[in-house]
């Protein structure tokens, strides 16, 4: 049996002699490479936190001590050390989540996987324990990149204000190529004032502040001015301690002994402490280290030796179609600029950045700032394209409403991973945008059904300069081209039977599902018209009179049923005095468990068979004319 196989709970880890810890680290890395390449998942981040996670569980008493993982994609090692070693169905239906999960273990606390939130959670948990007289430590592990999020600094400000509140912040800094000098630094927890890496660590602190929206630059200037001329002008020690936080580090995050010593020192301090650990993303796996883009942040199913993908691809992804088209548009229009929030590659803007480096900005974990900055860019005469994951736009709703829409700014939002994303679980599904954004005056929302319409509707969107526009598309590969038979107003007619009784309104990617549904209904003697509204907000004015020609309207969307496109269509029909019932098919008002997209859609009834069955059962009974009675 391996050392790892004998670890069933954190106390088993504490019993290990120090000389076995290095061997355990290697076993964990081998396990991760073989397991994650079989299922897909976050590989690079977890390879980088092996020793750090071991040290955390040797020093603290989870779950009495609460260990919080910001974002949570680096929690695989934590799962292994807390009794969850069956990774055979990682991120699959019935298997382990790719993020912490309270349903899985009492050792997990935060499962939302949205960055920069852990420090706020830690602040609240620590205060709750103090109020209720409970013992135990609260430890928040946050990445250096997540410190660019404004929420993290709001939390730091409040944490620092409670000077007698024991709370430990571990910064997992894996975004720099430098490493601390080992020896006196690691063993004695000294500062870097006398080491060769001193200036680099100062640059880290300066960089974090200067990339932090709104408060970062003034805070940096204030600290610089207060200590100007002193040897430690930009020292992380000075920055964080001026905020009221004890600073320990930087520590070699791959030296278990050094990390344990730092954590024990922090544990003894009766107040907030920040422990700065330097780690290497992808450590121990050469292909990850050699991967310049993101050190295998996320991988699909692949051969661990050759790194060749083993899962078949069905063509280009929605993201790549957008990425190619925005480059073409950028070449035609010098006013087109782009913004993203720490997602340059995932949202398809890498090629745009290569081609137009002075016209793209990665603002960090700062969706709110992205939206407001876009309003400024638009007011200044440019047309910004803000590309983010659909689930993360929730953070910028107020800014989209009050800064972009209220001022009628020509900003285009591009939402990647819209609808059901599947294996990434509850917090990554982009299933709320078409509901939340229905209330934004002047906003136009496009839901393309295929690659051609991503290109066409993106061009239509960036042509609008007096109001915000939004285009949304899902994850994974684009399906086949879906041609239109006709155009009625702004609607594309995709299917029309001779005597249609049902009007199927297909929202974006659900067009193929609706076409298959129409075939099933036709086999049952029920004729259909299938239309793609293309722009789902506002409702096209030709839709109500078209609906009046049918006995039932069914709206099928990859979005919440609550207040979504179906609700907007029903409202439009009511306003037009069209008395035709509307059936809404969408995502129920619940959080969705992780599974493949097709499995999730089947579970919630968004399949052709299920939709056709429910439409057939709910179609109003046709009233036959009464027969005349003989005289």
Curated annotation (Swiss-Prot):
Thiamine diphosphate binds at residues 73, 113-115, 174, 285, 367. The keyword Cytoplasm does not apply. This is 1-deoxy-D-xylulose-5-phosphate synthase. Binds 1 Mg(2+) ion per subunit. It catalyses: D-glyceraldehyde 3-phosphate + pyruvate + H(+) = 1-deoxy-D-xylulose 5-phosphate + CO2. Optimum temperature is 42-44 degrees Celsius. GO terms for cellular component: cytosol. Gene3D superfamilies: 3.40.50.920, 3.40.50.970. Mg(2+) binds at residue 174. One of its GO terms (molecular function) is thiamine pyrophosphate binding. Its cofactor is Mg(2+); thiamine diphosphate. The gene is dxs.
